[in-house]
A protein has these predicted regions:
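Glycoside hydrolase catalytic-domain groove-lining segments
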Residues: 162-165, 179-265
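Glycine-rich beta-alpha junction loops
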Residues: 143-145, 218, 296-299
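Histidine/acidic-residue-rich catalytic or RNA/ligand-binding cores of hydrolases
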Residues: 266-280, 303-311
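Aromatic-rich peripheral "rim/lid" segments of glycoside hydrolase catalytic domains that contact
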Residues: 119, 286-424
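Charged helix-capping and loop-helix junction motifs
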Residues: 60-68, 234-240, 272-278
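Active-site mouth of glycoside hydrolases
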Residues: 2-209, 292
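Structural motif
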Residues: 39, 78, 250, 286-287
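Generic hydrophobic alpha-helical scaffold/packing signal
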Residues: 245, 280-284, 331
């Protein structure tokens, strides 16, 4: 990719959080989006709440859809393009699923024919309503909907890998039916990359939808294990971007870093700016990155109860729209990168990944796993590592297409960084 990467934010309304759809105020939305645009960002990701938009399986509320269109138009008036998440789904520790899928109407979210037909119609309806808006980027099927399919969810809708793939393809196709030619994709949390046996897989992420999507959160054990300023913490997003690539059928499939944030106390507030700058720069040292979308635009109003503590302060701006250190750091980095952007050179050294689709393979990729730790030792040693599956490590044509000239086995990575000059 030679185009300058996109820089955006996940929009968290200042008044009422995502419950603002119940008391929708376009003036509040406009003020929020003004404060986002002032940071120099170019897009937002927005979140309808599924139960509010589709309270009955055969009812997608026209007024709710009109409000979504008004929000998207307000963003466009401020030079912001918009990605819309459909099935919300899961947000900041809360689940939002409609009553027609729970309790007396309990049905599997991924396999019940009536539920999946209702979901597809909902996604098609939202996409169709926005299809003629030039500032509409496309749909994301939902926010980390994979969380509903397996542990540690308290009430999972269990499915197989094949059923997950079928569901994803159907939902992406529904988005395409509503808005042909836009950028439609799906999003998982890092269980897809790190959890053995999870039904949503790296191959699903890298082969279904218009681009691959990663969400990077260092509260997953990375910062706890390595510390807030360690290579592993500041390179976690870059690692996920590179880990996403080997499964792609196209060697230069775009990868979107769709969520990344500075969660306290794992990243102390006094380090939030430095962490933001390092994370963005490291992510953009990976080839084929479509863009970086920070979580989130504004802090959560502390008058709202029961959020995990770290969720309240993830904003680039405060709840009263004042720029925080992370927001200032991102704005400065964006301005500089737009002026000086050059596509990163290929990562010529790749770490070989064994058994990633089998028992133990994905766990090795997680923080503390043998593959994760070897990759981070290489990164700390000045190498710019890529990732390659064992089955393609001897495929000269595939390696050449990705710009890889050297492959390294995890067992051959020294246990302690040696500090030569940068390689790869």
């Amino acid at each position: 990719m030679t185009a300058t990467p996109r820089f955006g934010v996940n929009y968290t309304p200042t008044r009422g959080w995502f419950h603002h759809w119940l008391d929708f105020d376009l003036d509040d939305v406009r003020a929020d989006l003004d404060s986002v645009a002032e940071l120099g960002l170019d897009h937002v990701r927005v979140f309808p709440l599924w139960p509010l938009f589709q309270p009955n399986r055969t009812l997608v509320r026209p007024r709710a859809v009109e409000q979504l269109v008004a929000l998207v138009d307000a963003a466009g008036e401020r030079g912001l393009e918009v990605n819309v998440d459909g099935l919300q789904g899961h947000l900041s520790s809360f689940d939002f699923v409609p009553s027609w899928t729970t309790t007396w109407h309990r049905r599997n979210l991924f396999t019940d024919p009536e539920v999946t037909a209702g979901q597809a119609e909902y996604l098609r309806t939202l996409a169709q309503a926005l299809a003629d808006r030039p500032h509409f980027l496309g749909m994301t099927v939902g926010n980390e909907t994979n969380q509903f399919s397996s542990d540690p969810h308290p009430d999972p809708d269990r499915i197989t890998e094949a059923e997950a793939a079928e569901w994803l393809r159907r939902m992406v196709a529904a988005c395409e039916a509503g808005a042909p030619g836009r950028t439609h994709l799906h999003a998982s949390d890092d269980a897809a990359w790190y959890a053995d046996g999870h039904p949503f897989t790296p191959a699903h992420a890298a082969r279904i939808g218009a681009m691959t999507n990663v969400h990077s959160w260092v509260f997953n054990g990375t910062a706890q294990r390595h510390g807030p300023s360690a290579t592993a913490t500041e390179q976690h997003a870059a690692y996920l971007i590179e880990l996403a690539k080997p499964w792609a059928e196209e060697p230069h499939r775009p990868v979107w870093l769709q969520e990344v944030g500075a969660p306290a106390p794992h990243v102390p507030p006094e380090r939030a700016g430095a962490f933001t700058t390092a994370t963005v720069r490291n992510a953009l040292d990976c080839p084929d990155v479509w863009g970086v979308t920070w979580w989130s635009s504004h802090d959560v109003d502390r008058s709202l109860a029961d959020f995990p503590e770290l969720e309240y302060d993830l904003g680039l701006l405060t709840n009263d729209r004042r720029v925080k250190p992370a927001g200032a750091a991102l704005a400065e980095a964006v301005a500089e990168l737009r002026q000086s952007w050059r596509p990163p050179r290929a990562r010529t050294t790749a770490l070989v990944l064994h058994g990633a689709d089998g028992s133990g393979g994905r766990a090795a990729c997680a923080p503390g796993g043998a593959y994760f730790e070897a990759w981070m030792r290489l990164a700390a040693d000045g190498v710019r590592p890529a990732c390659v599956l064992a089955e393609e490590a001897a495929d000269a044509e595939r390696l050449a297409a990705r710009g890889i000239s050297e492959v390294v086995e995890p067992r051959d990575v020294p246990p302690t960084p040696q500090r030569p000059g940068p390689r790869g």
